[in-house]
Amino acid sequence: MIKKYFDPLRMEKSLYEFWEKNGYFKPQNNKGKPNFCIVMPPPNITGNLHIGHAFQQTIMDILIRYNRMIGKNTFWQVGTDHAGIATQIVVEKKILKEENKTVQQLGKKEFLERIWKWKNTSKNVITSQMRRLGISVDWTHEKFTLDPQISFAVRKVFMTLYDECLIYKRKKLVNWDPVLKTVISDLEVKNRNVIGNMWYIKYYLVKNHSIKISQEYYLVIATTRPETLFGDTAIAVHPNDSRYKKYIGCYALVPIINRIIPIISDEFVDVNKGTGCVKITPAHDFNDYEIAMRHNLSIINVFTRNGKITDVIEEYDISGEKSCIYKQNVPLRFHHLDRFIARKIIVKELIALKLLIKIQKHNLAIPYGERSGSVIEPLLTDQWYLRVEPLAKIAVEAVKSGKIIFIPKKYEKIYYSWMNNIKDWCISRQLLWGHRMPIWYDKKNNIYVGLDEKHIREKYHISDDIFLIQETDVLDTWFSSSLWMFSSLGWPNNKDLFKNFYSTDVVVSGFDIIFFWIARMIMLSMHLIKDHNGNGRVPFKKVYITGLICDEHGKKMSKSKGNVVDPLDMIDGISLDALIQKRIKSTVFSTHSKKIITQIQSLYPNGINSSGVDALRFTCAALSTPTRYIKWNINRLYGYRNFCNKLWNASRFILMNLTHEVEPVKLILIKPMSLSDRWIVAEFHNLVKRYRTALDNYRFDIAANVLYEFVWNKFCDFYIELVKSFINSCSMLELKSTRCTLVYILDSVLRLAHPIIPFITEEIWQKLQVFVKKNDKNTIMLQSFPKYDVKLVNKTILEDMDWIKNIFIIIRSFRMDLKISHTTLISISFKNVSSKIHKLIEEHKDYIKKIAYLDNVSIILSNVDSMLFFKSYIVLGAELLIPYSKIFPKEKELKNLNKEISKIQLAINKLQQRLSNEEFIGKAPIHVVKKYKNQLQIYIEHKTQLCHKKLTMLRD
């Protein structure tokens, strides 16, 4: 027998072990059935899963369970990502904190061993959290992005792209993190708006490329980065700026270093910003770099890779080749100074040289490294790049032609905007952790690319006596992630898995990585994976983009804000003190602690109650609206915990009232079926139609809402309450019909709800199997999914029952208001009845009497005054009347009327007294006087109605 109280934590672990042990998550290999595959975006091994992971994994699991139950061969590939830079930083910090050692002190070999140890621990934590969430992935094919098979696939792809001249090495401007000493992606750069300074500096004009003009002739340059002036190679003005047109083609002198540079024109210059004159420093500003490309300017690097002033400048042309147009070196006094210290000294020298005109406060967007917190430096470095323009065309066409569909469709615009302005992708990183690039050099720096050194020697015919050394850079994590759709399916070795499940059906992702992951997967997959006609195969047919889960105030979650929601806290619950300690511990800035504590105390004064996995999953489904940002709401979680309780209690009632073996699939053949039985079956099939349509259209929020509305309002609060009212007084045939209907609906609801709330549905379904004829599949997840049957949806029954339901609710509320037992018989009448409702009442009079505990139901044909009745209600097609009786006698009602009339008269007297006060009328605002007059009129009208009712009752 089902336990009295719903206790999700008691059953979740054992149920998941039951599923996994029996291999229910594996493809079922149903011959002749279509395949359905999802490859999970691999979580980073940097720490615990957060609510965003739980949200997306719930969505994916709903899709997998739904498609499994409709008979498809489902495969859900799972794995974790090595997350190069993120993992390296986490482990570095851990070692520094625990052992006070740097990576340099530890050594490369030992450090990598520590990361692999971290990986094993972190992966176990992550996969255990996934299991807690109930996700039905095939664990027998779990992957890691640095697994040997994946690494082989990555090397093979790199070699292929290099041999096709799509990968090349070149010196270009990149986002350089001086603390991490590596190039980072745009995704890892965060701009912070700050109030900084704008320095206005004199650049003297020169004549004949060498002679300084008198000090009256100069241009004023406004800059926010005076420390970069050692790298200036031009001054730019707008071609249509009348102030500076005459200087275009002239030359100017860079302060302190005395380099002579040209004055050029470029439409990029904003005439309204600063002075309209811009110093061009191509090696340390991305906009300046683009201007240098257009005007063939020299590019001068003045910073080292740790953000200090170099002792010897590095000069290059626009192709990245070394150049030596300018001879000036950085003055000795600036060598090896940190860039921000150099800034202060340069400003002091400019003041001493009387070259600094003014300093002005200015709003700036400063680029910071998301992981290191350091100011990012645009830096000219040698990196490896992938040419993406040839790949982008076919990827754009795949979406335009409908081979790949974005859901919601609005995200196609974001995809196109990036793809149509795409630039070559920097794929190298200066890290220790990651896929080491399959590149080798000889002593002459000749480049060789292959699967490994042995393969390279064979490929390029290099003898063993020639020394080769491997490139130290690793690949950008996004490179291996972009191959995940096919590499995780065993490509190029595991032919069966790849053959059966590629292309995958849908990828679930956030809008913030459309550029960095989705687009790149499409490009590389379609370039590398071809059909028998040589056409590119899409990696997935649909892209479902979820919103970003934010905190209760709509703010993005981050550890520094102390607002990250741990899904396990929602499942298991956590005390207020433990929650505060947990979130404070994870914050980066201790100055925020007091504010964070106050917020936590306000949001969770009693901590967080245990709600179980199903409540969390239901919340995730219900929150999945097609919006960009989604507010987390703890009250929704508690509401869906109550839903699970409701379903549990309803199931318990049904199971307690079953004594005969029934077979749900034959339910509709059992006669007689009562009106309410036929109504609930019809309502259920309407639910099936709406629910499946919602799932098929990726509207999990709608699916959750219609399921909730049916189970709570129609099945539990109405149908089951009806059954309770007559189950002990009906005939055996009626009882059998009702029991079968209860089982049919419960069994069907459990199967319908299973993709969203798998644990409670499996637990109840297993208990229900004691009373029904079993099939050979011992789990609900392999049962067939309910199908819409139009033959079971009778429109007349739905309309009739909705009308009767309304009458039932009115009478139930009436009983509750007057504290009358639901078993006490009362009488009702109807007047002003339409022909349709007249027919309905006559046809179902006995049924109405039975379910509402009525002594008599009559139809009044004469035009009697409603005032003669105790209560009257206007309903569709009639007026419902409840006559006086021994339960509510006329004398008692007259007494109540007199009390009400006296009460209203007192209110009228008070208002009339106030409105007759001339002093009040003279001083009070017009709208206040008007408000009192309106109140008086309402009271007078109400009193008139009550007096009319009293007189009518006295005359009768």
From Swiss-Prot:
Pfam families: Anticodon_1, tRNA-synt_1, Val_tRNA-synt_C. SUPFAM superfamilies: Anticodon-binding domain of a subclass of class I aminoacyl-tRNA synthetases, Nucleotidylyl transferase, tRNA-binding arm, ValRS/IleRS/LeuRS editing domain. One of its GO terms (biological process) is valyl-tRNA aminoacylation. It is an enzyme of class 6 (ligase). ATP binds at residue 559. Disulfide bonds: none annotated. It is found in: Cytoplasm. CDD domains: Anticodon_Ia_Val, ValRS_core. It comes from the Bacteria. Keywords: Aminoacyl-tRNA synthetase, ATP-binding, Coiled coil, Cytoplasm, Ligase, Nucleotide-binding, Protein biosynthesis. Residues 889-920 form a coiled coil. GO terms for cellular component: cytosol. It catalyses: tRNA(Val) + L-valine + ATP = L-valyl-tRNA(Val) + AMP + diphosphate. Its EC number is 6.1.1.9. A motif ('HIGH' region) lies at residues 43-53. The keyword Ribonucleoprotein does not apply. A motif ('KMSKS' region) lies at residues 556-560. GO terms for molecular function: aminoacyl-tRNA deacylase activity; ATP binding; valine-tRNA ligase activity. Monomer. HAMAP family: Val_tRNA_synth_type1 (MF_02004). Belongs to the class-I aminoacyl-tRNA synthetase family. ValS type 1 subfamily. Catalyzes the attachment of valine to tRNA(Val). As ValRS can inadvertently accommodate and process structurally similar amino acids such as threonine, to avoid such errors, it has a 'posttransfer' editing activity that hydrolyzes mischarged Thr-tRNA(Val) in a tRNA-dependent manner. ValRS has two distinct active sites: one for aminoacylation and one for editing. The misactivated threonine is translocated from the active site to the editing site. This is Valine--tRNA ligase. It comes from Buchnera aphidicola subsp. Baizongia pistaciae (strain Bp). The lineage of its organism: Bacteria, Pseudomonadati, Pseudomonadota, Gammaproteobacteria, Enterobacterales.
